[in-house]
């Protein structure tokens, strides 16, 4: 079998195509979640914490070079200048992104699993008692009631 034919067979399998579609949709979905966190959740968190902007929270670890022209209070300016900074604010934002994404995926999987479950039918009525059992019960009852 030629290598091209093997690759074509591999690439056109359902699992590979499903994975490709999942990656593309996941990338688009990640953009949506990032926007939700950045534009909707973090402003509310900032408002609740008195205007705290997490994206600019950091601890400077290295010295500022003499040629530095930016603001020493700006995380991005310090990073651009090559100063070592511990950007815990960015980490908090990424962590919130991850938690929201994980929760939404959990809800989606739960929803899909519920769709896959067969509808739980109401308990079926017991089958009618067979005639031979009814006859045996009659015989038993008549023997109980007959004098000995």
Swiss-Prot record:
Main location: membrane
Pfam families in the cross-refs: MscL
UniProt-listed NCBIfam families: mscL, PRK00567.1-4, PRK13952.1
Subunit structure: Homopentamer.
Function recorded in the entry: Channel that opens in response to stretch forces in the membrane lipid bilayer. May participate in the regulation of osmotic pressure changes within the cell.
Family (UniProt): Belongs to the MscL family.
Protein name: Large-conductance mechanosensitive channel
The organism of origin for this protein: Paraburkholderia xenovorans (strain LB400)
Gene name tied to this protein: mscL
């Amino acid at each position: 079998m030629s290598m091209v034919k093997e690759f074509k067979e591999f690439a056109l399998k359902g699992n590979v195509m499903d994975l490709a579609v999942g990656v593309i949709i996941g990338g688009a979905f990640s953009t949506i979640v990032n926007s939700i966190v950045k534009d909707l959740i973090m402003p509310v968190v900032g408002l609740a914490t008195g205007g705290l902007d997490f994206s600019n929270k950091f601890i400077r670890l290295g010295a500022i070079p003499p040629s530095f022209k930016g603001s020493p209070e700006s995380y991005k300016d310090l990073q651009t200048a090559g100063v070592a900074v511990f950007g815990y604010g960015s980490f908090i934002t990424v962590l919130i992104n991850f938690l929201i994404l994980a929760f939404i995926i959990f809800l989606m999987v739960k929803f899909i699993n519920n769709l896959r479950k067969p509808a739980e039918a109401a308990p079926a009525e017991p089958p009618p008692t067979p005639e031979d059992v009814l006859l045996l019960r009659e015989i038993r009852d008549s023997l109980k009631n007959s004098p000995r």
